[in-house]
Regions:
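Conserved acidic, metal-coordinating active-site core of Asp-based
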Residues: 42-139
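Alpha-helix boundary/N-cap detector
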Residues: 19-23, 84, 88, 168
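Mg2+-dependent phosphoryl-transfer enzymes with acidic/Ser/Thr/Gly-rich catalytic loops
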Residues: 118-193
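Exposed alpha-helical structural elements
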Residues: 23-27, 88, 92, 127, ...
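General small-molecule cofactor/ligand-binding pocket signal
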Residues: 11, 108, 165
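Hydrophobic, Leu/Ile/Phe/Ala-enriched alpha-helical segments that form helix-helix packing faces
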Residues: 27-43, 89-101, 180-184, 188
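A short acidic, often aromatic-flanked loop/helix-cap motif at beta-alpha or helix-coil junctions
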Residues: 1-6, 18, 114-117, 170-175
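Active-site phosphate-binding/coordination module
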Residues: 1-50
Length: 193
């Protein structure tokens, strides 16, 4: 990278190319239909716009909108805990996809307010293909490590090597990273002596 904070893209792929145009359109129509059901259910939640984001390799769907402020996010989180909005719609989305014969698309919880939808096999472990185990000690911190969470597969993959950590938020993430860095610095100083 040329400057701090910049990155080098090492791989790019497309969900639409992987599953095909027709399946991709079916996925999008299903997401839009499910969003309409959430609106029609008249939950006491705000809708802020920007509900869908095509990230190339996946679709991110946020029922309240990706641009929601913190107050709106907290309102949705409370309602989701009480009514299980996202759990219901994960199950409904899966049933609808299976009824259409689409078995190669996955939906998982993403963060506190959204879903991630991607081709089967393209969970976060997909990135490890670009970092051979012999060359990298990949560590992972995630907030959705349970079975329906978008961090689950990578968390489980690295957990047996003590290289994955579940976090409750940004403050704990900083603590986890600080601990990992301090352990690494301790190992380096042992090697130097």
């Amino acid at each position: 990278p040329d400057s701090p904070g910049s990155f080098i893209e090492i791989f790019r792929t497309s969900m639409e190319d992987k599953i095909g145009f027709e399946k991709f359109q079916l996925v999008m129509k299903t997401i839009i239909s499910q969003q309409a059901k959430i609106v029609e259910a008249d939950y006491d939640i705000p809708f802020t716009g920007h509900h869908f984001q095509n990230r190339g390799s996946m679709i991110n769907w946020s029922p309240i909108g990706r641009n929601a402020n913190n107050g709106s996010r907290q309102q949705f989180i409370a309602m989701d805990k009480m009514c299980q909005i996202r759990s219901q719609h994960i199950n409904m989305f899966r049933r609808l996809m299976l009824s259409e014969g689409v078995e190669d698309v996955v939906i998982k919880l993403g963060g506190d307010t959204s879903f991630d939808i991607y081709p089967a096999g393209w969970d976060k472990t997909f990135a490890l293909k670009h970092f051979p185990e012999s060359d990298w000690d990949v560590m992972f911190v995630g907030d959705r490590c349970g079975p329906n969470g978008n961090d689950h597969e990578l968390y489980e993959h690295l957990r047996h090597q003590d290289r994955s950590f579940e976090t409750s938020g940004p403050e704990e993430t900083i603590e986890i990273i600080d601990t990992c860095i301090n352990k690494l610095l301790g190992v380096i100083s042992e090697i130097d002596t």
